[in-house]
C-alpha cells in the first residue's frame, strides 16, 4: 500500500490494556491551565511502572464545570494495582496542579469502571484543615493553600483503556522528522479520547534488554547510526536516516484507530517520509493488534 508515494508496510502496532483517569483542569487564566496540564503530563512512565499522561484538548469556560478556562488530560497506568495508581497519580496532582494558583480538578472519565479516592493522598495535603463541599452536584475537597484554595473532586473515575498504539514514519532528513511529526500531532489532537504521551518520540524501544534494571532499551535494529555496525541485522531501509515514532493512548479502540489513520495520513503529505511502519514484539508487549492496512482501508 502507498499513500502519496509513501510505502505503508503490511504490519501492525501492538498495544496493551491499562487504566485511565480522564480529568479536567481549570484555572483563572489559560496560561496557568496550560502550564498545569503540560507539567502534569510531562513524563511518560508506563513502561517503568509509573503513570503517563497527555493533554487531550484545551477548553473555553463554556465547556468546563466551573466556567473557567480548562484542559482535558488523561493519566494512564499499565498495572492492576489501583492503590499504586492512586499514589502515582497523586504525585502529578500535588506537584504539578495543586501548586499552580487558582486551580481545580474535576473527574471527566466517561462510563467509569470505578473510582480513586482523592482524600488520602491529595486532600490531606490540607493537613487536616481540608473540608468537603458540594459544587454543581459534585463532591469537592477544598484544600486550603496560601493562594486560596485548591479544589479537587473527591473521587476520580477510571476506566479500562488502551496504551502503546504506535506508528513509525521513516524520514530522509531531519526537517521532515519535525515538520511531519508536528503535523501528525495536530491531526491526532482533533480526535476525541486520545493523547500522545511522548509527542514526537526519538527513541523507539524493545522489551528485550541486556540491562533489565533499566527497563526497555533502544530498538537497536532500527537505529540508523548502527546500520554499518549491525550489517544484516539492521532493519533501517536504504535512504532512511531517521525513524521517529508517534505513540497514542486512547479510551477506546475506535478512537485509537481514528487517531492512527489521521496521524499516518498527515505524515504521508511530506515528501521526506519514505515509509510508515509500526512497533510489534510477537505479543510480548500487549494483546491488542492494530493493522496499518486495516486502519487505512
From Swiss-Prot:
Which Gene3D superfamilies does this chain map to?
3.30.70.520
Q: Name one GO molecular function term.
A: formylmethanofuran-tetrahydromethanopterin N-formyltransferase activity
**Keyword Transferase carried by entry:** yes
Query: Highest taxon of the source?
Result: Archaea
Q: Does the keyword Nucleotide-binding apply?
A: no
Query: What GO terms in the biological process aspect are recorded for it?
Result: one-carbon metabolic process
Annotated keywords? Transferase
The family classification in the record reads:
Belongs to the FTR family.
What is the name of the protein in this document? Formylmethanofuran--tetrahydromethanopterin formyltransferase-like protein
Instruction: Give the gene that encodes this protein.
Output: ehaS
Amino acid at each position: 500500500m502507498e499513500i502519496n508515494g509513501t510505502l505503508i508496510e503490511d504490519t501492525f502496532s501492538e498495544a496493551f490494556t491499562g487504566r485511565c483517569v480522564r480529568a479536567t483542569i481549570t484555572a483563572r487564566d489559560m496560561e496557568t491551565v496550560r502550564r498545569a496540564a503540560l507539567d502534569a503530563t510531562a513524563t511518560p512512565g508506563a513502561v517503568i511502572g509509573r503513570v503517563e499522561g497527555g493533554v487531550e484538548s484545551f477548553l473555553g469556560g463554556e465547556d468546563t464545570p466551573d466556567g473557567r478556562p480548562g484542559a482535558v488530560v488523561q493519566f494512564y497506568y499499565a498495572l492492576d494495582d489501583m492503590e499504586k495508581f492512586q499514589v502515582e497519580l497523586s504525585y502529578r496532582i500535588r506537584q504539578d496542579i495543586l501548586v499552580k494558583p487558582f486551580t481545580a480538578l474535576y473527574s471527566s472519565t466517561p462510563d467509569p469502571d470505578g473510582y480513586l479516592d482523592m482524600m488520602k493522598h491529595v486532600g490531606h495535603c490540607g493537613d487536616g484543615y481540608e473540608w468537603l463541599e458540594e459544587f454543581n452536584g459534585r463532591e469537592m475537597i477544598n484544600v486550603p493553600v496560601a493562594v486560596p484554595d485548591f479544589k479537587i473532586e473527591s473521587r476520580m473515575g477510571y476506566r479500562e483503556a488502551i496504551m502503546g498504539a504506535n506508528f513509525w514514519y521513516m524520514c530522509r532528513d531531519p526537517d521532515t522528522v519535525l515538520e511531519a511529526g508536528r503535523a501528525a500531532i495536530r491531526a491526532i489532537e482533533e480526535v476525541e479520547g486520545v493523547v500522545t504521551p511522548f509527542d514526537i518520540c526519538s527513541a523507539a524501544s524493545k522489551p528485550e534488554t541486556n540491562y533489565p534494571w533499566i527497563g526497555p532499551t533502544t530498538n537497536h535494529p532500527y537505529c540508523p547510526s548502527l546500520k554499518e555496525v549491525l550489517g544484516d541485522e539492521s532493519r533501517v531501509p536504504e535512504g532512511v536516516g531517521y525513524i521517529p515514532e508517534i505513540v497514542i493512548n486512547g479510551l477506546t479502540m475506535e478512537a485509537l484507530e481514528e487517531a492512527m489513520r489521521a496521524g499516518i495520513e498527515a505524515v504521508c503529505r511530506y515528501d521526506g517520509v519514505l515509509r510508515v511502519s509500526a512497533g510489534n514484539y510477537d505479543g510480548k508487549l500487549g494483546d491488542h493488534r492494530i493493522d496499518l492496512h486495516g486502519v487505512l482501508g
